[in-house]
Amino acid sequence: MPHPHPVVHFEILGHDRKLLEEFYKGVFDWQIEPVEEWYSLVKPGSGINGGIGAREQHTGHVTFYVAVEDVAAALELIESKGGKKAWGPQPIPDGGIVAGFLDPEGHLIGLVQGAPGM
């Protein structure tokens, strides 16, 4: 039986998006498609899709996204278990909703609701 909350997306964020794109394309031959000035979609060919982006206010990090039925309800549960909302909820272009939270040790994890491509 499939797990009800699969990991559906990953993100690699750093200061220089183009440098990261060139690195991962060169190392893994990933297909990379820019969608915004600061962000590109990554299609590795098999497995889950992801993104590479630039965020000046953050140190480099990797985030994965977990599919949930209701982002707001998931954030409430997370906070009741000792996590903290980091950002969102916010809509994304394909109609989904995303948010981020920090686990009890400060790891940033994403949530996604209703995104067809994720």
Regions inferred by a protein language model and the residue ranges of each:
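N-terminal first-folded block
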Residues: 6-43
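Vicinal oxygen chelate
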Residues: 2-3, 7-15, 56-118
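Residue-level recognition of oxygen-bearing side chains
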Residues: 19, 47, 73
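N-terminal beta-strand motif that seeds the catalytic metal site of vicinal oxygen chelate
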Residues: 1-21, 62-64, 114-118
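Conserved active-site tyrosine of GNAT-family acetyltransferases
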Residues: 20-24, 78, 106
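Conserved short beta-strand elements that form part of the metal-binding/catalytic scaffold
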Residues: 28-62, 108-113
